[in-house]
Amino acid sequence: MKKILLILSLLFLVACSNDEAKYDGAPLKIAVVGDIPKLNNEKIHFESISLNEFSEDTLHISTNFDAVMITPMMFEEASEDRFVKVYNNSKIPIIFFDSTKRHFPFTSEGLTYETANWESLNNGSHTTIYLSDVDENREDAWYFYLKNEKKLDTLYKKIFQKIESL
């Protein structure tokens, strides 16, 4: 009887640990400034772009992509004042992936990722989606949390579901 309970317990644990959260919504095309995520999902297409491409041809990027993702390797340059208007005038959501300082260093003039005060900006979030609507004089931000690095698939799924809904 103990052996049966042990075997059933092990099967239950194995079944739970293999639970992978995978985005299965509409196909999304995401422009990436920085490192392309290592994500294997046929519904998500990543394409590398530069900050200059994004700033010089915002209309083309907004028309051909569902979102722009900026990754940590580009945060310092991406937080330069010359890009603030680009983010605030973008017609598509911007994902600041793995930014503990949220979107503020990128959307506020006179502030860079390096100089932004971490203690005052850290709300515990891992990633922020930012969307500004100049015509409506409105900006929205959605925060995503990652408590366990093993749950990165779940984080991506939530981010992509939000992008799909916008």
Please name every model-derived segment.
Residues 1-4:
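Positively charged n-region of N-terminal signal peptides that target proteins for export
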Residues 12-15:
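C-terminal motif of bacterial Sec signal peptides marking the signal peptidase cleavage site
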Residues 17-20:
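Bacterial signal peptide processing site
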Residues 32-33, 68-72, 95-98:
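Conserved beta-strand segments of the P-loop GTPase G domain that flank and frequently precede/overlap
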Residues 33-63:
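A short, well-structured beta->alpha microelement
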Residues 36-37, 82-166:
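Extracytoplasmic electrostatic interaction patches
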Residues 42-43, 75-84:
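Active-site-adjacent loop/helix micro-motif of nuclease/hydrolase catalytic cores
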Residues 61-75:
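Short, well-ordered secondary-structure micro-motifs within conserved domains or adaptor modules
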